[in-house]
Amino acid sequence: MKNVVIAGYARSPFTFAGKGALKKVRPDQLAADVVKGLLTRTGVDPEDIEDLILGCAFPEAEQGLNMARLVGFLADLPLSVGGVTVNRFCGSSMYAIHMAAGAVRMNAGEVFICAGVESMTRVPIMGYNPMPHPGLYERYPEAYIAMGETAENVATKYQITREAQEAFAVESQRRAAAAQAAGKLDDEIVAIASDDGPVDKDGCIRPESTAQALAELKPAFDESGTVTAGTSSPLTDGA
């Protein structure tokens, strides 16, 4: 079997949903801009690309239809480049890589673009009109469990204390801020055009976070739980 390699990587900045610098940018355009930036950086011939595999957790509205194909058009890829949108919730873009790697090893193509995009501003969690199956919800409500509740379950199962979560969160923010200040994230970010000018910096880093401040927050998902807004991933827009 062929060996599989990741030959290049690019991303947009990640900014807060609803109030960040990317809130007015459509997700399909956001993904297309990143694809364009990736091709410019790598010098890959678009004619060699077999498929664009795009992960998206809530593929509806501006993220709807087969968004991967539409992103290909917006990124000026040749018509010969296919497009498929993958939904495995939080693992969607990771699974796009798994799919491409399997295809390469099976000789079903040599060059793939694996991507992911989510605008939590433009398409809210659970989408615009969630309609759980009544029978399934009654019999197995866990099928519709939210990630925050899952985090509580994981913390309980593996005995991860609130203090340990908050220490990890503070260190994560510190490292992210240090990396940004040192310019270590610059090479991977594609600047995105917005109404207020180019967006080229992550907007979700909070270096002012402290263990003392996080300890004052109320649990976000279970009133007797340990997970708070300070130890949860923020709602973001990005690709």
Label each region the model flagged:
Residues 7-9, 112-118, 193:
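Short beta-strand segments
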Residues 40, 44-47, 78, 105-106, ...:
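Structural alpha/beta core scaffold segments of enzyme domains
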Residues 105-158:
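Flexible glycine-/small-residue-enriched beta->alpha junction loops
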Residues 86-117, 155-185, 238:
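Active-site-proximal alpha-helical scaffold in enzymes
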Residues 17-19, 64-65, 122-128, 203:
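Short acidic, glycine/serine/threonine-rich loops at helix termini
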Residues 56-110, 141-149, 208-234:
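Conserved catalytic cysteine-centered active-site region
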